[in-house]
């Protein structure tokens, strides 16, 4: 006899993509918290460049259509939504440089950037939804960490888009200073092109020397601080 799935339970192997909505924000509002900010970061995995965090408070009456996890969107669609988010929402952006990442670690640097983004919002948040497992310490308001939050909350999705587009633009500028690594193409991730550039030229000042692939390489070209924190 075939086992039955309980009527109110999702299929165990349901792989349908999540679609972000405003339910978590409305739940916080019902509990007395308003406004609600979503926060996310971009750039935890690359071998070079900063980690960038964004915090976004959406206007419930002007939510851009098509918000989703930035990784599920084309570069062109991210750029389009980026413009719409900046025009309709309260947005704050912060970053932690590769130097800060090396001095602490990527988790601490990411949470610090997220904390600074949240605390710099022009309209103080009463509650924060963050993507992942952690709420940054040191906030002036309570918050909730949401696993796969950028696919569940439109506020977090908006923050993921702002962080991703901002970081991609920063790495495009870095490419003009360090053209030997191909930053404009891979934005610092460990692609074959990037690793070949490191092998030929050594790392530059934007590389994260604490990351395992770079720990044994010699210092290459340096420059003044290119990307402000």
Curated annotation (Swiss-Prot):
A divalent metal cation binds at residues 40-41, 131. One of its GO terms (molecular function) is RNA-DNA hybrid ribonuclease activity. Its EC number is 3.1.26.4. PROSITE patterns: RNASE_H_2 (PS51975). Manganese or magnesium. Binds 1 divalent metal ion per monomer in the absence of substrate. May bind a second metal ion after substrate binding. One of its GO terms (biological process) is mismatch repair. This is Ribonuclease HII. It comes from Rhizobium johnstonii (strain DSM 114642 / LMG 32736 / 3841).
């Amino acid at each position: 006899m075939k086992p039955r799935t309980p009527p109110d339970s999702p299929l165990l192997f349901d792989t349908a993509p999540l679609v972000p909505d405003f339910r978590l924000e409305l739940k916080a509002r019902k509990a007395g918290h308003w406004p609600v900010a979503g926060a996310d970061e971009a750039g935890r995995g690359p071998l070079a460049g900063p980690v960038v965090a964004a915090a976004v408070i959406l206007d419930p009456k002007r939510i851009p259509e098509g918000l989703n996890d930035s990784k599920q969107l084309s570069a062109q669609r991210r750029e389009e939504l980026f413009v719409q988010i900046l025009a309709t929402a309260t947005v704050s952006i912060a970053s932690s440089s590769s130097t800060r990442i090396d001095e602490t670690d990527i988790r601490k640097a990411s949470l610090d950037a997220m904390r600074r983004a949240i605390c710099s919002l022009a309209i103080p948040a009463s509650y924060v939804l963050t993507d992942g497992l952690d709420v940054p310490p040191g906030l002036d308001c309570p918050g909730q960490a949401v696993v796969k939050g950028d696919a569940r909350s439109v506020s977090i999705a908006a923050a993921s888009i702002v962080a991703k587009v901002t970081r991609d633009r920063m790495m495009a500028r870095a490419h003009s200073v360090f053209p030997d690594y191909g930053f404009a193409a891979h934005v610092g991730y460990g692609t074959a092109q990037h690793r070949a550039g490191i092998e030929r030229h050594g790392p530059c000042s934007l590389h994260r020397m604490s990351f395992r692939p770079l720990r044994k390489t010699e210092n290459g070209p340096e420059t003044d601080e290119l990307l402000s924190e």
